[in-house]
């Protein structure tokens, strides 16, 4: 079949590149971070993205209608919310009553266009989509393996060449009924470009049909396409390119060609209709527009509640020198701990800043040669650091132990020796099994020698970095005697997603290395002298101490040994007591949300429980991002649902810090928020399924069962507590106290960030001089004034 003119390689490559960029990247498990599953659709509205994803995968982008109807019925969503949302898209319904009527009616299910594999399955009764997913998955698990496999696949070839070598010896497709598949593969052109051009022309694809059809083929590969997209992402960060994802597209296209060659007579006519449907422009239908309006209305309801929170009484500004200042990551889990800590005494002040603390190191841990990229995945490393100490003997001993452990592990898993291992050494593990089963194993706390820059940088560069970071934190005066810089990390067992519970701003690692590095920088006497010349004076009696906040148990570890100071012994003792008390208060609050947690002791036990699928809720529930002075949120409960970034625009000359916040932390927070959103509204596609069925493959990700499609996104247990959702899928509300003109100027310069707000993947609000949500960004650089939630209550004195 070829009813169209020949496709040009240029057009095919352009469409293939667009399809590749419609796929989000997937980071490996060792350093996994949240990724926006709609990353390739942010230039479109929610309804239009729903039409596109519906065509290629049948993906819902909102909750079922009944979800919204229930919230309309119980008053959560008011008529005012519905009317305001309808004003954004007035063509969705004739009026308010019509919109309510739509909410009561179930929408039509999104059905994807069939692939050739689907059509061949219908014609033959053979599950070709399942077979090709299994065969491609089996090959991809070996090809992308990151050290889990005992017999690793060679990486000398590109993905296309490696697959051809594999597929010519794979008889499973022929056994299943695809005659001559191995021969077909052996006769494919030597280059992926030639192979994809031949296949596309043989299938009769038009230029117009390529866009969504090629996207669909990559979409059917699930996480394997996302692993390939990750390779392209990393290559482009380094100023290079990578063809893995286009090779994967060629592989999937060749499967279509092979199936078409066998079943053309049975499916040819139906296939022509599919090609024509792919060629039609993507457009949202009435159902999708109604759904988008209902989602908007629900978010308006949440924003009403947020505005009420901002209108609550705030503690009076206190310029006296605090006894303790503690800087935490902006992560929503920090909000609960910060609130608990500040409630103990007015002498404690907390700050919020991105958890990488402005440093972008490629770090080598103690006795390790692995580069850990402890920085946001949007950036390249700007520094190198190490925890290698001066004790060469200790380093070598640790390396010997690590090698012995790896060798022992391979002996346990090898094809032959594994049987002898179980027979000979099984009883030795009885004690360990009992200890682990009873949750008696101690929590692991990252330690090691104090990290340092290696190589170091000159004093001017160190001073520049210190000034930039302190100004970005709006932290340039009134320093306490003790300033704790707290990174964060999780402490769990038997959890492939452990790195996803760590600090996203640190690339999926815990944040203590960055915190300790910054503490060392700010304790440097020469750096402090340089800062004085730049208008920042840190008192001689101020000491900075790195720390780690364990978000699973809310324990705090201080690394005071990095900078021993007898003069601060009493300060440290008092701080540790405060942290213990705050941890207890925080655990009590978290226990109210966690299933089967009856008290603070249960929280500690959960972190060591092999069978616990919900050791913590991580960022479930996130709904807001606030960049403002701490005074605007202090003393108010944001329920662990808000990212809190300290920012004082009056100290920000030229609005460079504001630009950094809007283009980095806000974007990272959007990735987190939209990953939770996608894993909730479409768990079958954008979620990784049931933890109880997971098998780790290749150190990359997980599959459900014994192979097939790599699952991505969050497990079901991360967004659902068994009876109801733990996460409410709300697009993030970003609240910034800064002039609207400054924010608009930044949006003008950054098209990608502007698209997030213009297309309502994020909502933007300007806080006024009283910290109230006063202005809403409507898109296209336009703002509208908001009704005052209630009269702002005056500041109040804080009781000592």
Curated annotation (Swiss-Prot):
GO molecular function: zinc ion binding
Transmembrane segments: none
Residues the entry annotates as binding Zn(2+): 329, 331, 488, 503
Cofactor(s) in the UniProt record: Zn(2+)
Keyword annotations from UniProtKB, A to Z: Cell inner membrane, Cell membrane, Membrane, Metal-binding, Transport, Zinc
Gene Ontology cellular component terms for the protein in this record: plasma membrane
Keyword Membrane belongs to the record: yes
Subcellular location as annotated: Cell inner membrane
Subunit structure of this chain's protein: Forms a complex with DabB.
Protein name listed in UniProt: Probable inorganic carbon transporter subunit DabA
């Amino acid at each position: 079949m070829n009813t169209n003119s020949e496709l040009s390689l240029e057009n095919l490559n352009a469409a293939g590149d667009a399809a590749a960029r419609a796929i989000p990247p997937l980071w490996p498990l060792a350093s996994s971070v949240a990724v926006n599953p709609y990353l390739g659709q942010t230039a479109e509205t929610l309804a239009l993205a729903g039409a596109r994803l519906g065509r290629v995968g049948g993906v819902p982008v909102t909750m079922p209608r009944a979800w919204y109807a229930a919230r309309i019925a119980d008053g959560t969503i008011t008529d005012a919310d519905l009317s305001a949302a309808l004003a954004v898209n007035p063509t969705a319904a004739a009026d308010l009553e019509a919109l309510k009527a739509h909410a009561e009616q179930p929408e039509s299910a999104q059905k994807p266009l069939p692939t050739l594999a689907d059509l061949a399955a219908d014609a033959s009764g053979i599950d070709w989509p399942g077979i090709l997913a299994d065969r491609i998955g089996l090959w991809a698990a070996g090809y992308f393996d990151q050290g889990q496999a005992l017999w690793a696949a060679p990486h000398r070839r590109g993905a296309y060449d490696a697959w051809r070598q594999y597929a010519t010896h794979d008889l499973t497709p022929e056994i299943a009924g695809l005659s001559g598949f191995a021969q077909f593969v052996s006769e494919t052109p030597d280059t992926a470009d030639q192979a994809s051009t031949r296949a596309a022309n043989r299938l009769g694809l038009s230029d117009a049909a390529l866009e969504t059809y090629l996207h669909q083929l990559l979409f059917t590969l699930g996480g394997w396409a996302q692993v390939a997209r990750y390779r392209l992402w990393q290559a482009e960060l380094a100023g290079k390119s990578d063809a893995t994802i286009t090779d994967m597209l060629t592989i999937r296209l060749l499967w279509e060609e092979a199936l078409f060659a066998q079943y053309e007579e049975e499916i040819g006519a139906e296939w022509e209709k599919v090609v024509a449907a792919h060629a039609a422009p993507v457009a949202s239908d009435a159902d999708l527009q109604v759904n988008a309006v209902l989602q908007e209305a629900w978010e308006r309801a949440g924003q009403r509640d947020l505005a009420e929170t901002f209108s609550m009484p705030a503690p009076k500004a206190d310029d006296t020198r605090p006894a303790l200042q503690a800087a935490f990551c902006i992560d929503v889990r920090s909000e609960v701990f910060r609130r608990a800590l500040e409630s103990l005494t007015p002498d404690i002040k907390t700050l919020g800043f991105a958890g990488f603390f402005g440093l972008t190191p490629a770090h080598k841990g103690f006795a390790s040669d692995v580069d850990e990229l402890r920085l946001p995945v949007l950036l390249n490393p700007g520094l190198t650091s190490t925890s290698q100490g001066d004790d060469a003997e200790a380093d070598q001993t640790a390396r010997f132990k690590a090698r012995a452990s790896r060798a022992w592990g391979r002996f346990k898993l090898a094809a032959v020796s594994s049987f002898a291992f179980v027979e000979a050494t099984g009883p030795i593990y009885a004690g360990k099994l009992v200890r682990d089963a009873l949750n008696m194993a101690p929590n692991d706390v990252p330690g090691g020698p104090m990290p340092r820059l290696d190589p170091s940088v000159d004093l001017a560069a160190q001073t520049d970095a210190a000034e930039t970071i302190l100004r970005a934190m709006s932290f340039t005066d009134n320093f306490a005697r003790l300033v704790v810089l707290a990174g964060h990390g999780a402490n769990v067992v038997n959890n492939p997603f452990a790195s996803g519970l760590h600090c996203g701003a640190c690339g999926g690692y815990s944040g203590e290395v960055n915190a300790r590095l910054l503490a060392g920088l700010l304790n440097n006497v020469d750096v402090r002298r340089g800062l004085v010349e730049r208008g920042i004076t840190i008192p001689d009696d101020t000491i900075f101490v790195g720390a780690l906040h364990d978000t699973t148990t809310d324990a705090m570890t201080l690394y005071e040994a990095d900078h021993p100071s007898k003069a601060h012994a009493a300060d440290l003792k008092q701080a540790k007591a405060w942290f213990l008390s705050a941890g207890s208060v925080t655990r009590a609050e978290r226990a109210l949300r966690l299933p089967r947690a009856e008290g603070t002791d249960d929280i500690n036990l959960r972190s060591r429980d092999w069978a616990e699928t919900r050791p913590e809720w991580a960022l479930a529930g996130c709904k807001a991002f606030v960049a403002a002075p701490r005074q605007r949120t202090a003393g108010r409960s944001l329920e662990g649902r808000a990212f809190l970034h300290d920012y004082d625009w009056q100290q920000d000359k030229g609005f460079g810090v504001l630009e950094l916040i809007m283009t980095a932390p806000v974007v990272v927070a959007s990735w987190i928020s939209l990953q939770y959103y996608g894993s909730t509204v479409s768990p079958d596609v954008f979620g990784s399924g049931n933890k109880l069925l997971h098998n780790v493959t290749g150190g990359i990700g997980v599959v459900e069962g014994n192979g097939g499609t790599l699952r991505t996104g969050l497990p079901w247990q991360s967004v659902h507590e068994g009876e109801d959702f733990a996460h409410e899928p709300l697009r993030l509300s970003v609240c910034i106290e800064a002039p609207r003109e400054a924010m608009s100027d930044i949006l003008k310069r950054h098209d990608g960030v502007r698209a997030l707000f213009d297309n309502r993947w994020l909502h933007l609000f300007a806080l006024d001089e009283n910290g109230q949500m006063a202005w809403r960004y409507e898109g296209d650089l336009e703002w509208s004034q908001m009704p005052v939630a209630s009269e702002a209550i005056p500041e109040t004195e804080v009781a000592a």
